[in-house]
Design a protein with these regions (language model features):
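Active-site-facing substrate-recognition patch
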Residues: 1-53, 103
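PRPP-dependent phosphoribosyltransferase catalytic core
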Residues: 3, 132-174
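Residue-level signature of catalytic and energy-coupling elements of molecular machines
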Residues: 21, 56, 78, 148
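Conserved acidic residues
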Residues: 54, 116, 146
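Short Gly/Thr/Asp-enriched flexible loops that form oxyanion-binding sites at enzyme active sites
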Residues: 65-74, 135
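Conserved G/P- and acidic residue-centered "switch" motifs that form tight phosphate/ATP-binding loops
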Residues: 123, 128
């Protein structure tokens, strides 16, 4: 079993990416190591164990990497959140603000129904904008968010403030 410090050591730091002054946390080095990948999934699963929920909801693309194995291990369905125009059937959408513009995310209209409970899984909690938009999209169907779970949290950006009163967990904190 890896300690959290050992797991954290598998995340590469890249200064000045994508722009000067940003320290990028690169998970590709964690994904490359089978033990680190396995341990990250174990920690995410622990964060949702015992919580009543029906589905894992996760955004493309890195949310898929971590959300799918959590859904599999917890014997739950997986609902992908995609960028606008990527899902083939009728969708519902949520537009939200980015640092430099706007983005739109979608789920299939029939993916969730009132009373469904979901856990939202993603690789990173930064400003919280994407997580908030996913929560609002889920709630627009009548479903509820039981918990957010993130592999990494950038605490200095205060993303948790946008999660409202929904419980959340993050495995690695910076």
């Amino acid at each position: 079993m890896m300690t959290l410090d050992q797991l954290k050591s598998h995340i590469r730091e890249i200064p000045d990416f994508p722009e000067k002054g940003i320290l990028f946390r690169d998970i590709t080095t964690l994904l490359k190591d089978p033990n680190a990948l396995r341990e990250s999934i174990v920690h995410l699963n622990r964060a949702v164990y015992g919580i009543p929920f029906d589905y894992v909801v996760a955004p493309e693309s890195r949310g898929f990497i971590f959300g799918m194995p959590v859904a599999y291990e917890m014997d739950k369905g997986f609902i992908p959140v995609r960028k606008k125009g990527k899902l083939p059937a009728e969708t519902i959408a949520k537009e939200y603000d980015l640092e430099y513009g706007k983005a739109t995310i979608e789920i299939h209209k029939d993916a969730l129904k009132p009373g469904d409970k979901v856990v939202i899984v993603d690789d990173l909690l930064a400003t919280g904008g994407t997580a908030k938009a996913i929560k609002e999209l889920v709630e627009s169907t009548g479903a509820t968010v039981s918990k957010f779970v993130f592999l990494i949290e950038l605490e200095g950006l205060n993303g948790k403030e946008l999660l409202g009163d929904t419980p959340y967990a993050s495995v690695i904190k910076y």
